Amino acid sequence: MGQDGSPAHKRPSGSGGGLPTTTLTNGGGRGGRGGLLPRGRQMQKTFNNIKITILCGFVTILVLRGTIGVGNLGSSSADAVNQNIIEETNRILAEIRSDSDPTDLDEPQEGDMNPNATYVLGPKITDWDSQRKVWLNQNPEFPSTVNGKARILLLTGSPPKPCDNPIGDHYLLKSVKNKIDYCRLHGIEIVYNMAHLDKELAGYWAKLPMIRRLMLSHPEVEWIWWMDSDALFTDILFQIPLARYQKHNLVIHGYPDLLFDQKSWIALNTGSFLLRNCQWSLDLLDAWAPMGPKGPIRDEAGKVLTAYLKGRPAFEADDQSALIYLLLSQKDTWMEKVFVENQYYLHGFWEGLVDRYEEMIEKYHPGLGDERWPFVTHFVGCKPCGSYADYAVERCLKSMERAFNFADNQVLKLYGFSHRGLLSPKIKRIRNETVSPLEFVDKFDIRRTPVETKPQN
């Protein structure tokens, strides 16, 4: 999709554009006698030509009848209508992707970002904890805990424009369906964002202003949980062990040895993390954001990150590398409140997981969340919405289909159905209807099933 810059193929014109012709001179033909056939032979030749013409016409009618049918000869108008719809749809999609809007003519042009100015997400707030405490006391109908559990808001999203690859929109829909299922079953609120709240922080960085805005607009929420659109819940039963994080404000998947010993750029993964709604988190976002503005600032910051972090390719600054750099370079300021989680897969890299789903089904059960039955399968590098990816498109799409159906089977089980296979959208019945349906609710309802978790080291 998109413009590739290749020239359009046009029919040649001018001296070389027509069909080849032969110019006959006055003496042309065989010995100059081309038009001197006897009258009888001329009439016979004309009659033969007429017969050939009639025969060709008859054959043409037979061919048309065999391919489109006589009754379908009138379908050309319907085809024209369909073609017009396709062209109109493509035109609208092109306009949406172009960023042009005639209603924005009166809006002033945004100036370029000053590379010498430190970027800020918004007005500096220094007393958020006290402001939030007062608000919660004044609004008891919006408690920060529900049924004894801290209130969580899951934030995810995708770009405001249609995907470059049309099938990407289909997998975005499957991804949000998967997240809605998990949140519905675990009493978690969900926000799906498709807006760039700050044009300077597009791409990887778009999550930061949205997280901050949700914190300030929903003081009743205790945790904001960011999750990339290309990450799927694959253990629908598993629950975040929030009690483990009472003294922490950031929960992120990673490995301390890769972080502190190797300074690896993949020591942490920002595709799925939890951030507590508190002053500490606002301060972290303020410290995290300055590398994010697009343009020279992001480009120069990328060079710093590549030089500092092991294994990082040379490209513009991304939010994950910037967070790792911040936690390493200001360890005393931040790390006391950061929980680097690897007891379960808050982020699970897809390549080592998707081909083992059948083995997991045979040996284990949902609710484990770790390598035995991964909580989250994250399709890093697949970019189903983009026009390019780091892995083969077919491999990515088949793997995403397997992950979605693996998770969906856990949801469908309550209703007595399952996918026919991990690559099949079709479903089959796995148990018969009964006059006592509530026994299946008690047996299969995910909300009633106890969860096994690993002990903390």
From Swiss-Prot:
The chain crosses the membrane at residues 52-72. Keywords: Glycoprotein, Glycosyltransferase, Golgi apparatus, Membrane, Signal-anchor, Transferase, Transmembrane, Transmembrane helix. Disruption phenotype: Root hair phenotype, characterized by short root hairs with bubble-like extrusions at the tip. Alteration of the main root cellular morphology. Reduced xyloglucan content. The keyword Translocase does not apply. It comes from the Eukaryota. Interacts with XXT2 and CSLC4. Interacts with FUT1 and XLT2. This is Probable xyloglucan 6-xylosyltransferase 5. It comes from Arabidopsis thaliana. The lineage of its organism: Eukaryota, Viridiplantae, Streptophyta, Embryophyta, Tracheophyta.
